[in-house]
Amino acid sequence: MKRSGQPARTNGASKRRRSTGDSLLESRAHLSPFPVVLNFRKPPDAPSPGSWLDRLKRGLKKTGSQLTGLFGGTKVDEQLFEDLESALISADAGLDATRTLIERLRARARKERIETPQGLKEALGAELAALLAPLERPFAVAGHKPFVIMVAGVNGAGKTTSIGKLAKWLQGQNLSVLLAAGDTFRAAAREQLAAWGERNGVAVIAQDGGDPAAVIFDAIHAARARGVDVVIADTAGRLPTQLHLMEELKKIKRVIAKADRTAPHAVWAVLDANTGQNALAQVKAFDDALGLTGLVLTKLDGTAKGGVVAAIAAQRPVPLAFIGVGEGIDDLRPFAAGEFARALVD
């Protein structure tokens, strides 16, 4: 029997043929009940359409248009503040964040004697950036090798896709990556992660069924043996109300610590921006269970309102590590408070 975490042997029938520019799939996860390594070669980078800020503005256009449309008048009056308050609440900012922003905006307008809607618009951008600033935190993997990122989230939030995009971003920082297919119950999840591994040219540790904690444990040891910089561990999607599944997440975190007593070095929850205030409830639940160190907010691509970021800042300021604005492989970037505020208000 081969050792766990080592590449599986394949016979002629199980090997895939090489095609031009493609990598060889050393072993297919569904052929073995043991953890296997899927090795892929990194393909050439594809050009990214448009600047990141432009894509972010397009993604937040719905809320941005509502907000900027309020500043077309000629005076700053009580009606303008009331309209701003309604627009922020409609954008999923929530009552706490909205009240904080409006109070700060009123105080700033008085102090700086702002008398034009354009001046108030600029002040709103500055106050929004200040509110979101605690969510912005530099992401660095120095000090740990491998640096282990545990990723959780509800079904359909874009977790596996975000992992694939994150791997690409990390490669752009000259870091090597290994993916752990910790969702062992859904074959589609493993196949999706393997596809991202092939697309990025990174190895994937996978297993058909079995204990997800064991797969991630093996992945950490495989990464250490290979000298890999970062391990990203996928986990099965679950609702915070599924208490037994939340307990499983806690177990996975404990097992990761057995592989490396300093790990996981990051524990992230992936959120769908389209879920609005429900995303805030997810943050609270996953944070209470796991002690989150970061968030990934996905699907800011034109239908989401984006105000939930302000709600998170006001009520549960877990750092927002990355945001995603589309389906492209480069459509995931580190969160920048000032940039996000400009995209909403400019």
Where do the PLM segments sit?
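P-loop/Walker A NTP-binding module and the surrounding RecA-like catalytic core of P-loop NTPases
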Residues: 129-132, 137-346
